[in-house]
Amino acid sequence: MHSTQDDKPLLKVQQLCIANETGQTLLDDLNFELYPAQTLAMVGESGSGKSISALALLGLLPETLSVNGKVELENIDLLKLSQPQLQQLRGKRIAMIFQEPMTALNPLHKVEKIVGESLVLQGLSEAEAQQKVISLLHDVGNEDAQQILKCYPHQLSGGQRQRVMIAMALALEPEILIADEPTTALDVMLQTQILDLLKKLQQQRNMAMILISHDLNLVKRYADQVLVLNQGKVEEQGTISEIFDQPKTEYTENLLNHNFGQALVLEPAETLLRLENVTVKYPIKHGLFNQVKHYKVAAEAIDLSLMQGEALGIVGESGSGKSSLALAIARLIASEGDIIFQGNDLNQLNQKQLRPLRSDFQIVFQDPLSSLNPRMTVEQIIGEGLKLRSISKALITTKIEEVLSKVELSIDSKYQYPHQLSGGQRQRVALARALVLQPKLIILDEPTSALDRSTQRAMIQLLRRLQQQDQISYIFISHDLQVIKALCQKIMVMHQAKVVEYQATALLFNQPQTEYTQQLITASQYGASCN
């Protein structure tokens, strides 16, 4: 809570309204006050107006959107400032952690420049800026800060990129930090570490925070006030106890419902996929001639088997090798060992031999905005794979509309581009693109990470239904053990590139064999203590 001496709001939002060029209201009559050291959480379903509200505060909305109302930062109306005036405030007084770091971080710059650029502009020498960057990277949980310093964004894991984003936002010590899904790609233990850090910095700097999150477990533990948005309107707002203990609307009650149901009970079936001693390693290059000096092992000696119609959950901390293993299974990166899919060793096939099998295994990536072509409409994105088949345009259109309905997107969304969709909607487009090819195996890398609880529940129900109807198998990579528990029959726990536990879901939750697994389970439980 804000202290009594801070009786004046740092930020005051009055009657904020946002509409698009056709006059459609995207945000209607938003009002709130934010005090120093206070955390205000914005929650709501995907597309409810959370992110556009935050972008409006920073003057980052497209010019095609009209904005009305008042946004006062200590009597300065931000909506009346020019772009040069706003640029003077961004980073120094108000900073933002964006939802999708892969698209927010400059791909041409190394981490050292990405985080340190603003520090150099403030007058620090390059050496001083480098030391500050290393300190910031350590603060947000990067033990190997010196190595990360020299990496480009694409060389980092999703969680590492998100931590770089947080370090960049904290560099100039802003008075207000807007955190749009700041821990989406992080494992549950690191989520707690990052938000504990942000809470500590709040107290030290008297920093206010707007926390945009679909994770109500984190909201309950770290926020002071909650604002619930529904289709651009405020459904209700109040203290943590008011919203969580006495919700006034059915919409809020549905958001708070964290029961995803149970995974299907399966009959024995044929083995679809088998991994034997699979290892993934990346070359580390140094020197004038960029020679390979050594290798970083991302996944070591992995064995697993997956039946037709079965779902395997893979969990572990950020950088543990989960995504690298997924890319290796899909033959998108090289690996050693045997990957046997439908009787074929994928590692022994060349690209021509592999092509006929590609539609049978699909992958849904962690960061949908960077995996969807920005120049293509949703219809073109989903239909791209179908065009390689000898089927009519009419049938392609029918299949696209069917799969949009399956993932609960409107038929009209097929005319939109990725940037016009919310994070959750983009994730459903990515799933639709995979489903339309009717694969036997779908590898899902954090597919529900950007979704609110009610949309997560709908997605899990959809995946279960497809699993039952079409005998689709899943490899489901996630840091959210509650989601994995609701879908997967088996769970593999990875830690520092190795498998530390691999067993049936019920057995793993009831009798975890390692302390690391127990820590993951404890941290994922709804309402768990943050200590």
Task: Identify the role of each PLM range.
Residues 78-95, 121, 242-247, 288-293, ...:
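ABC ATPase NBD coupling module
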Residues 234-238, 246, 499-503:
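ABC ATPase "signature
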Residues 128-147, 394-412:
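Conserved ABC ATPase "signature" region
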Residues 219-221, 484-486:
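A short, surface-exposed alpha-helical micro-motif characterized by mixed small hydrophobic
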Residues 171-175, 436-440:
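A short, proline-enriched helix->beta-strand linker immediately N-terminal to the Walker B motif
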Residues 66-77, 337-345:
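Conserved ABC transporter NBD signature motif
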Residues 151-156, 160, 417-421, 425:
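Conserved ABC ATPase signature
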